[in-house]
C-alpha cells in the first residue's frame, strides 16, 4: 500500500499548517486564560470556525459525505496528516468541526440515522451549529466492558424510557451540546413473553435530546490539565 500523501492531501496539509500558524497559535494564550476562568468556549471560536470553513478546512474526517453535505470527503489516509497538524493544539480540532465526540457521533448518524434523525441531528452537527456527547461510562461499574453497564432502555408504547446514570461524559456540559448518544442495555420486559438475549446482544444506542424530560447534568467533573466540559 502506498502511504505517500496525495497531491490534494498535501495541499490541504499546507493550508492547514498555515492556518494554524496564522490564526490558532496567536489565540492559544487567550484560549487557556478563557477556559481557566470558566469562559468556555471562548468568544473567538465561532469566528475561527467561520474562517476555517471559508478556507475549505471543514468536516475533514468523514469520507462518505453526500454532495449536499459540507466537507472534503477525504479518505482516512488523506485525513491522517491533517489530524497530526491539528494535534499541535488541544483545542484546534473544534475549529475545523473535527473534534471528538462529535466526529464519531456524526459517523454513526451518517451510517444509521433515519431521514428525520439526519435532519434533526446530523445536519446541524455537520454545520457546526450544535455539539453532542457519547454517554457510556458509569460510576459503579467497570464500563470498558459493556456487559457491566447498568443503564437500561425499555419501550412504553411509542416511547423509549432510559433509566440510569452516566459520568465522565465529554462534552455533556458544553453550552452548545444538544444531543446525547446513550449506550444502554435492554431492560427485561417480563410481560413480553420474549426471552432476553445473552449479555453480548442486549445493547442499544439511543438518541436522547439533552432537554428531554428527566435528563439532568448534575455536575461538571474536573480532570487534571483539562478545563473543557
What do the PLM-derived regions correspond to, one by one?
Residues 1-14:
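Intrinsic disorder at enzyme termini
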Residues 9, 20, 56, 82, ...:
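Buried hydrophobic positions in well-ordered alpha/beta secondary-structure cores of metabolic enzymes
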Residues 26-51:
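Short secondary-structure junction/hinge motifs that connect adjacent elements
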Residues 49-119, 123-128, 171-179:
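Internal helix-loop-helix
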Residues 128-137:
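A short, Trp-centered hydrophobic/proline-enriched beta-strand micro-motif
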Residues 142-163:
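Cytochrome P450 C-terminal beta-domain/meander region
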Residues 148, 154, 211-229:
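Flexible, small-/acidic-enriched active-site or ligand-binding loops
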Residues 159, 163-218:
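A short core secondary-structure module
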Amino acid at each position: 500500500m502506498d502511504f505517500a500523501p496525495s497531491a490534494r492531501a498535501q495541499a490541504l496539509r499546507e493550508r492547514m499548517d498555515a492556518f494554524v500558524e496564522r490564526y490558532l497559535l496567536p489565540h492559544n494564550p487567550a484560549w487557556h486564560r478563557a477556559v481557566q476562568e470558566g469562559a468556555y468556549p471562548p468568544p473567538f471560536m465561532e469566528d475561527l470556525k467561520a474562517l476555517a470553513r471559508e478556507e475549505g478546512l471543514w468536516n475533514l474526517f468523514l469520507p462518505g459525505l453526500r454532495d449536499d453535505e459540507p466537507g472534503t470527503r477525504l479518505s482516512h489516509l488523506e485525513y491522517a496528516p491533517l489530524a497530526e497538524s491539528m494535534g499541535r493544539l488541544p483545542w484546534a480540532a473544534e475549529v475545523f468541526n473535527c473534534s471528538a465526540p462529535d466526529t464519531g457521533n456524526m459517523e454513526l448518524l451518517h451510517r444509521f440515522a433515519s431521514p428525520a434523525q439526519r435532519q434533526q441531528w446530523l445536519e446541524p452537527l455537520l454545520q457546526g451549529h450544535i455539539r453532542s456527547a457519547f454517554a457510556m461510562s458509569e460510576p459503579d461499574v467497570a464500563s470498558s466492558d459493556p456487559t457491566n453497564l447498568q443503564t437500561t432502555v425499555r419501550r412504553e408504547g411509542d416511547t423509549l424510557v432510559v433509566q440510569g446514570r452516566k459520568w465522565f461524559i465529554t462534552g455533556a456540559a458544553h453550552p452548545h451540546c444538544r444531543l446525547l448518544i446513550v449506550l444502554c442495555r435492554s431492560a427485561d420486559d417480563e410481560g413480553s413473553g420474549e426471552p432476553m438475549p445473552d449479555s453480548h446482544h442486549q445493547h442499544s444506542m439511543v438518541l436522547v435530546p439533552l432537554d428531554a424530560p428527566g435528563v439532568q447534568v448534575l455536575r461538571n467533573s474536573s480532570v487534571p490539565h483539562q478545563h473543557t466540559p
